[in-house]
Amino acid sequence: MEVVILNENGDSVGNLEIVDEIFKSEVNNNLLYEAIKNELANRRQGTHSTKTRAEVSGGGKKPWRQKGTGRARAGSTRSPIWVGGGKTHTPKPRDYSYRLPKKMKRKALLSVLSLKYGSNVLKVFEDFTFDAPKTKRMASFISKVKEPNTRKVAFVVGKDESLGDNYNKLLLSLRNIKDLKLVNADSMSIHPLFYADEVYFTKTALSKLNARIKG
């Protein structure tokens, strides 16, 4: 299939031939759910920790004798039912990350791209050239080409030697724009693509993805 390449003004400047499955695969919602859940789990720090009755300070001595006081019996001030006592079934540091099979990740990526392309919210732009990084220029470009109701934008970029230093200048120009998420074509995440109102590709980024999918 061919996709239209746009310039900074949103005008067509050519086409790019890519394999059909990138934008015309069957959308698998269950697979998208599993892929997004996996990405979010892998982001978790897992540093949560609460002290048990064995770890809180104090409470080594029995507060009062067993009988004869009229009060409920107590063996330690570290008991979970006491104020300042330890907690039961406490969260402890753990690793939440797990691996998703490569074929599942690949199909999930094709699903989210096909979903966005089928919804007419995916655009491909020619590569940008810069004399110097300019956030103002890219912010103006985004506001010009996006739809009126669009808030979140995912921008997929790809690095190539032919671009010279323009790749780094593009990153510097885009990274501080509100509600814009940068996505690297070499390691594309499903989460920012799925939750974006619009998805933009540079020509180089789509070419790299096409080469990867073709194998």
UniProtKB/Swiss-Prot annotation:
Q: GO cellular-component terms in the record?
A: ribonucleoprotein complex; ribosome
- Pfam families, per this entry? Ribosomal_L4
GO MF annotation list: rRNA binding; structural constituent of ribosome
Region annotation (Disordered) maps to: 43-97
- InterPro entries from the UniProt entry: Ribosomal_uL4, Ribosomal_uL4-like, Ribosomal_uL4_dom_sf
Residues annotated as coiled-coil are none
Key words of the record: Ribonucleoprotein, Ribosomal protein, RNA-binding, rRNA-binding
Which GO annotations describe the biological process of this protein?
translation
Give the family, as the similarity comment puts it: Belongs to the universal ribosomal protein uL4 family.
What is its biological role?
One of the primary rRNA binding proteins, this protein initially binds near the 5'-end of the 23S rRNA. It is important during the early stages of 50S assembly. It makes multiple contacts with different domains of the 23S rRNA in the assembled 50S subunit and ribosome.
> This protein is called what?
Large ribosomal subunit protein uL4
- Tell me which species this is from: Brachyspira hyodysenteriae (strain ATCC 49526 / WA1)
| Lineage start | Bacteria, Pseudomonadati, Spirochaetota, Spirochaetia, Brachyspirales
